[in-house]
A protein has these predicted regions:
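Loop/turn-rich, solvent-exposed surfaces of beta-rich toroidal or solenoidal domains
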Residues: 122-140, 163-259
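Structural signature of eukaryotic scaffold interfaces centered on beta-propeller domains
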Residues: 1-4, 51-57, 113-121, 165-178, ...
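Short loop/turn segments immediately following beta-strands, especially the blade-tip
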Residues: 30-31, 90-96, 137-149, 194-206, ...
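Asp-box/WD-like beta-propeller blade repeats and closely related beta-sheet repeat scaffolds
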Residues: 1-54
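Surface-exposed loop and turn segments in beta-propeller and other repeat-based domains
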Residues: 37-45, 98-109, 146-166, 206-226, ...
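Short, conserved, GDST-rich strand-edge loop motifs in beta-rich repeat architectures
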Residues: 11-20, 62-83, 128, 135-138, ...
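Beta-rich catalytic cores
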Residues: 20, 46-48, 84, 110-112, ...
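Blade-level signature of beta-propeller repeat domains, shared across WD40, Kelch, NHL, RCC1
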Residues: 233-314
């Protein structure tokens, strides 16, 4: 969901039959349906996230999969069968149609969240590739061409109960409102990371904390057993407080963290050092959704009613 002046665009993953690529819903300021936003989807096979920079007349969209593919759960073989995305799409924002595709290949398996810098003059942006556990940096060159590079690569980790090393599963990324820090999660590993992106070509790791995950490094946080891993997160506008939740998608939760059915999810708060870099879990904050009156419940994402780091575009 993103603002469009006084209006709203919402991305969809598929149609009523669960078939990709979906498209974009255009709402007016009263939340009444205007219609489809896009004039054409071109040959885009999948949809997921999007972000735009009006001053560059560009929108970038990413790919997950068709609802019929991901809703039953995750099957690694379907990645090889090309049922999951590996591309970013460049749009002509004014014409509302895709004009270019960046093929990421093995470096960009399941590219999910897309973020441009908040500076409206900047052409620099990032995408987190969930299965590859990489961060892709893209920008417009001086010649006016869109370029991309892999700037962060999270190594897979061995696990005694897994036949293959565990990928991080980077399901989200976030850029602070001042464009100084990029945050990422590794949902299966169990860590949150902070990178200084003052030089977007060379992010510098400045902070890391653990919560839940399959590696067993922080199974309990503030007295609560974390069944899940860091998944979605929201940063305060001053960049000092981050709220992290643990549920990705119910069937995927049940597949990788079956205890979440009975334990529920949790919200953890991280204190972020905006001057020198660094992260630490706030010891005085925890929300245990397993103890909800009608629970156990799961928590997916936190948003601010007046706008936040993941919705506001200038």
């Amino acid at each position: 969901v993103h603002c469009l002046g006084s209006e709203i665009i919402i991305s969809f993953l598929g149609n009523a039959k669960g078939e990709a690529p979906g498209g974009y819903l255009h709402l007016d300021k009263d939340f009444e349906i205007v219609g489809r936003w896009e004039n054409s989807m071109g040959d885009i096979p999948f949809s997921y996230d999007f972000w735009y920079q009006p001053r560059h007349n560009v929108m970038v969209s990413s790919e997950w999969a068709a609802p019929n593919t991901f809703m039953p759960g995750f099957d690694l073989e379907e990645v090889g069968h090309l049922k999951y995305g590996r591309r970013l799409h460049i749009w002509d924002f004014k014409e509302k149609k895709p004009v270019e595709t960046m093929y990421l290949g093995e470096d960009g398996l399941i590219p999910l969240e897309v973020k441009f810098m908040h500076d409206p003059d900047s052409s620099h942006g990032f995408c987190g590739a969930a299965l590859s556990s990489n961060v892709i940096h893209f920008w417009k060159s001086q010649e006016g061409k869109w370029e991309w590079e892999k700037v962060i690569d999270i190594e897979n980790e061995p696990h005694p109960d897994w036949p293959i090393p565990i990928p991080g599963v980077m399901s989200a990324i976030l850029i602070s409102m001042d464009d100084k820090y990029l945050y990422l999660n590794n949902w299966l590993h169990g860590d949150m990371r902070q990178y200084d992106i003052s030089n977007p070509h060379k992010p510098k790791l400045t902070g890391q904390v653990w919560m839940g995950g399959l590696l067993g490094k922080a199974p309990i946080v503030n007295g609560v057993k974390i069944t899940g891993g860091p998944q979605m997160y929201q940063l305060s506008l001053d960049g000092k407080r981050m709220y992290v939740t643990t549920s990705l998608f119910s069937t995927w939760d049940n597949q990788f963290y079956p205890e979440i059915r009975t334990q529920g999810g949790a919200m953890i708060m991280i204190d972020c050092d905006v001057e020198n870099g660094g992260m630490k879990i706030n010891k005085d904050f925890i929300v245990d959704f397993g103890k909800e009156p009608n629970g156990p419940s799961r928590c997916h994402e936190s948003r601010y009613p007046g706008g936040d780091c993941t919705s506001d575009i200038w």
